[in-house]
Amino acid sequence: MLYHVEMFTIILLFGFSLADYCGSDQVPYGMEVHHSGVVRLMCSKPNCYDKNYSDCPERAESRHGCQKSNQWVGGFEKNIEGDLYTMCCEFEGLEKYAKVRYSDVRIRRGEFFEGEEKENDDGDVVKFDVIKDIRMHKDDEGQAYYNLTVLSFNCESIPDVKPAWYQKSQWPYFQFAKN
């Protein structure tokens, strides 16, 4: 019985090391490949992205990366054969607010990429990097490496539109009859 518990624990830990996920309310700004080959996403929620959410599927389904102009990587999963599946989250207007910063960042074992944030004088984030796509390749020795496409997301270009309910919630609010 103890053997079965140990095997289950090992399989469970191995499964967790093959996937990573940022969620619909965070963005991937970096990626790390450990010497052991374990890949991790670095996730963040910049303050200018506070009230925004991306639309993410339940699991990593795309074998061909995040190719649409309104998508970025929300997570990934490697199956037992070593194939990489990406979870492509959609954000309405991404093509308007973000431009390609790096189109081919290569990361191998023992390396990492960390995007940048730019702040204004008040300390608010006005630009940040987000990983749009991850593609896995193998070198001549069969070792996996990853190519990233990185966008620079400009928060200042997002219009600050107040929701429809905002004006009505300001006190005093009186409905005047029209004569």
UniProtKB/Swiss-Prot annotation:
Signal peptide: which range, if any? 1-19
Please give the GO cellular component terms listed in this UniProt entry: extracellular region
Q: What is its main location?
A: secreted
Q: Which superkingdom does the taxonomy of this entry point to?
A: Eukaryota
Q: In which tissues is it expressed?
A: Expressed in the trinucleate pharyngeal gland cell g1, seam cells and hypodermis.
Where do glycans attach?
Answer: 52, 147
Cross-referenced InterPro entries? Dev_Signal_Hedgehog-like
The question of whether Nucleotide-binding is a record keyword is answered with no
What are the subcellular locations of this protein? Secreted
Keywords carried by this UniProt record: Developmental protein, Glycoprotein, Secreted, Signal
Q: What does this protein do?
A: Intercellular signal essential for a variety of patterning events during development.
This protein's name: Warthog protein 3
Taxonomic lineage from the root: Eukaryota, Metazoa, Ecdysozoa, Nematoda, Chromadorea
